[in-house]
A protein has these predicted regions:
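Rossmann-like dinucleotide-binding cores of NAD(P)H-dependent redox enzymes
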Residues: 2-5, 11-76, 80-81, 141-148, ...
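FAD-site-proximal beta/loop scaffold in flavoenzymes
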Residues: 1, 85-162
């Protein structure tokens, strides 16, 4: 895209903003937080934000997007303070909510957290006998590698094998940006 507005400065937002900037797009990164990558190491995040700015990215800290709409062949993003920014495209990277409503999970005995995530123990069991859950819907480290491990643990546990509980202290993650 010619001019990309990325709403959200977490890992996904930072990765896409950096990638599209490297491909030649003019990028505006809208962050509701004080800095990019708010959940990551502050020193590393500061370096990344500095590089983004030096490369020409418009990083808008403490700016919350209120709405986005198509206007002709453009996109308008209205911020909560009334400012409006425009671009050719907009990418929303503001997180996800689990799709667990109206599925009858609670009626089946599956306990949900207030956030809508499915409660599981360390071997992926839910509160309903014989029902397991794995992946982002559990609200545990939204990483593909963690989801795959949760799934393997659930399968082996269900089959009666001895399993080691998921140990989140040993999970590593990457942020795919340059730098």
């Amino acid at each position: 895209p010619e001019e990309l507005i990325v709403v959200g400065s977490g890992v996904t937002g930072a990765e896409f903003a950096g990638a599209y900037q490297a491909l030649g797009s003019k990028v505006t990164l809208v962050s509701s937080r004080d800095r990019v990558l708010p959940g990551e190491d502050p020193d590393a995040a500061a370096v990344l934000e500095d590089v983004f700015r030096r490369r020409g990215m418009n990083v808008m800290a403490r700016s919350r997007a209120q709405s986005a709409k198509r206007v002709g062949d453009r996109v308008e993003v209205t911020l909560s303070d009334g400012r409006v920014i425009t671009g050719s495209h907009c990418l929303m990277a503001v997180g996800a909510i689990p799709n667990t409503e109206c599925m009858g999970l609670e009626e089946a005995g599956v306990r949900l957290r207030e956030s809508g995530h499915i409660w599981t123990d360390k071997v992926s069991r839910t509160t309903a006998p014989g029902v397991y859950a794995a992946g982002d819907v559990t609200g545990v480290f939204a990483l593909a590698s963690v989801a795959a491990m949760q799934g393997r643990i659930a399968m082996y546990h269900f089959l009666g094998d001895a399993v080691a509980p998921l140990n989140l202290k040993t999970v590593s993650s990457n942020v795919f940006t340059d730098p």
